[in-house]
Regions:
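Short coil/turn linking the two alpha-helices of tandem helical-hairpin repeats
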Residues: 134-143, 206-215, 464-465
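Long, intrinsically disordered, low-complexity segments
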Residues: 1, 54, 72, 85-88, ...
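Conserved, well-structured interaction surfaces
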Residues: 17-19, 23, 27, 31-37, ...
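An aromatic- and glycine-enriched ligand-binding surface/loop that stacks and positions planar moieties
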Residues: 2-60, 194-197, 202-391
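C-terminal substrate/ligand-recognition segments
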Residues: 75, 79, 334-335, 339-477
């Protein structure tokens, strides 16, 4: 993307009529993606309160994770996300509205080519469709903004979900007619036909569950997803590890990334801090703040549930070794970040005389692909200087005796947990920063083809239980997962169910996509959260009760509440 240029002597209206000005306006529309998806707020909003992620600090009552009585319309996370989506929406509306005044090359030699302008507007419409979709799937209604707001508005009118989807599909149809299947070269990272069709497939799929659905929604979702798979030129990579290898981040599977790069203002990705054990504040002798592990935010907001660890078969499935700290990630030639820090143990970064030398083992996580993997009894643990945290075993719904979920187990930090970190987002270029600001350079994958396959599989199940296509597309993903695994033999699906789809989405996309929306869309949130998220059903040992039930999900939790802070800013906010 091009750098934006400030022209203080020129009005914004005049500047955005020029070729360079309008191009910078579109660049700004893409920059808004970082303001939404590169935030810990987004992590809380999309991962907490699910079957595969829970809170790191068990001594806190977390409304977004535990669905307590404190989950109300004044929730700051919900307001922040609402504001981010509408701010981004206003910028794309500005780009679309102002396109009518852009000077064309047919009228001025310095103007923009009409075909180039048409494509930029199509990109903006695809982005607008995505933001509108995010709003409607999370809140179900709201002000349907399709024009730029240049001044504050203190009165609004709500539009229902059906109206939102009508606009979404109109924008996507117009974008799909114009955009190329893929964006390459200097245009890589821009909206494409494949990205727009992926969005439309997901939008059809999501609307298909609603009371106002069109009878052909699931059929249309499948058609769009299959079209992307067959005709876009995107391919599932042979090796899951190569999907997440930082040195291979531009690859055939990625449909739409959010771009980061070296250099000031571009190296701001914070995903490498997510799901990372807060090692530097955990009271660990010999583990200090160091760029070897980079930032591990003291505000880690989500850690995997026991179910998230135990759903994988490490011997038959390549994905867990890529996803978590593991021997694979401890080898610079195979690791996701090209370094050796991802081995399944933390090493000493701050030597302690007579106790730990630099590089000594401090915390050890036995994992099933480790040649020395075993269950460590307390007597075994007492025989070594370092601390050992056993991999979860037994009932995946009961965490009471698992090392990962004990409060301050073997550490002086009385609030945090110590569990095997997710490593697939780690960044070989990130550095340690005291202010915890982002320093990562790797892209965020917003859409990739494996998810498109799982959209196709889910749509097939919901479209008159089309098992032939459901099995085909879910097993494309499973077949790739088996490749390069230690043993192979990963079972394929037959008679696919929605729970199978949710399981496979969790394994393939852990931490990448919005898990909360997957459970919300399918109506499985209460069932799976109450079963697999111990922190929801055992708040303070059961002394505080969650308000989540299937009935309360349908009545209250299926949609996010309209933020009270926003309503209070309106003159008609309480009508």
């Amino acid at each position: 993307f091009r750098d934006e240029v400030n022209h203080p002597s020129q009005s914004a209206d005049k500047y955005y009529q020029t070729k360079g000005g309008y191009e910078s306006l579109i660049v700004g529309c893409y920059s808004n993606l970082k303001n939404i998806y590169n935030t810990t707020t987004y992590q809380i909003f999309t991962q907490q309160g699910t079957d595969v992620f829970t809170q790191n600090y068990p001594t806190e009552v977390a409304a977004m994770n535990q669905y307590t009585t404190t989950y109300q319309s004044n929730n700051g996370t919900i307001y922040a996300m609402w504001s981010s989506y509408f701010n981004a929406l206003n910028n794309v509306n500005a780009a679309i509205d102002r396109s009518k005044s852009v000077i064309l090359k047919t009228d001025d030699p310095d103007g923009i080519e009409p075909s180039a302008l048409t494509q930029l507007v199509a990109e903006a419409k695809a982005l607008r469709a995505w933001y509108l979709f995010e709003i409607v799937r999370n809140w179900g209604q709201g002000p349907l903004k399709i024009n730029e707001s240049k001044e504050p508005s203190y009165t609004v009118e709500y539009s229902n979900g059906a109206a939102f989807y009508q606009q979404i599909f109109t924008d996507l149809e117009e974008a799909i007619r114009v955009l190329p299947w893929r964006q390459t070269g200097s245009n890589y990272g821009r909206m494409s036909k494949a990205a727009a069709k992926h969005i439309r497939a997901l939008a059809y799929l999501t609307r298909g569950y609603e009371e106002y659905a069109d009878p052909k929604d699931f059929e249309n979702a499948f058609k769009d997803a299959e079209d992307v798979y067959l005709n876009s030129g995107h391919k599932l990579l042979d090796d899951y590890a190569m999907v997440h290898r930082q040195s291979n981040e531009i690859n055939d599977e990625i449909i739409f990334p959010i771009g980061f790069a070296d250099g000031a203002n571009y190296n701001t990705n914070i995903w490498n801090q997510w799901y990372m054990m807060p090692y530097a504040i955990g009271g660990w002798l010999g583990l200090g703040k160091d760029s070897y592990y980079g930032n591990a935010s003291m505000h880690v907001e989500a850690i995997p549930t026991k179910f998230a660890y135990m759903m994988y078969d490490w011997q038959k499935d390549r994905r867990p070794s890529v996803t978590f700290m593991s021997p694979l990630n401890g080898n610079a030639s195979t690791s996701t970040d090209g370094k050796d820090a991802g081995k399944n143990w933390f090493q000493c970064t701050t030597p302690v005389d007579g106790v730990f030398a630099k590089g000594d083992k401090i915390i050890y996580f036995p994992v099933p692909t480790d040649p020395e993997y075993k269950y460590w009894a307390e007597t075994d643990k007492n025989g070594v200087r370092y601390k050992v945290f056993n991999y979860p075993m037994g009932d995946d719904t009961n965490w009471a005796n698992d090392d990962y979920y004990k409060h301050a187990y073997q550490t002086t930090n009385s609030t945090s947990r110590t569990c095997l970190p997710i490593w697939k987002f780690k960044d070989g270029n990130a550095e340690y920063r005291e202010d915890e600001s982002g320093s990562g350079t790797r892209d965020i994958y917003l859409f990739r083809l494996a998810e498109t396959c799982l959209i196709a599989a889910e749509a097939a199940v919901m479209n008159n239980n089309d098992q032939a296509n459901a099995e085909k597309y879910i097993n494309y993903v499973v077949s790739r997962a088996e490749k390069h695994s230690p043993q192979g033999g990963l079972s394929r699906y037959s008679n696919v169910t929605i729970d199978n789809i949710l399981d496979e989405r969790a394994k393939e996309l852990l931490g990448e996509g919005s898990r909360w929306n997957d459970l919300q869309r399918t109506g499985k949130l209460a069932e799976r959260v109450l079963k697999y998220n111990w922190d929801v059903s055992n708040i303070y040992g059961g002394t505080i009760k969650t308000t989540l039930t299937q009935e309360s999900f349908e009545r209250k939790f299926k949609l996010r509440p309209i933020p009270l802070q926003w309503l209070n800013s309106l003159s008609n906010g309480h009508e």
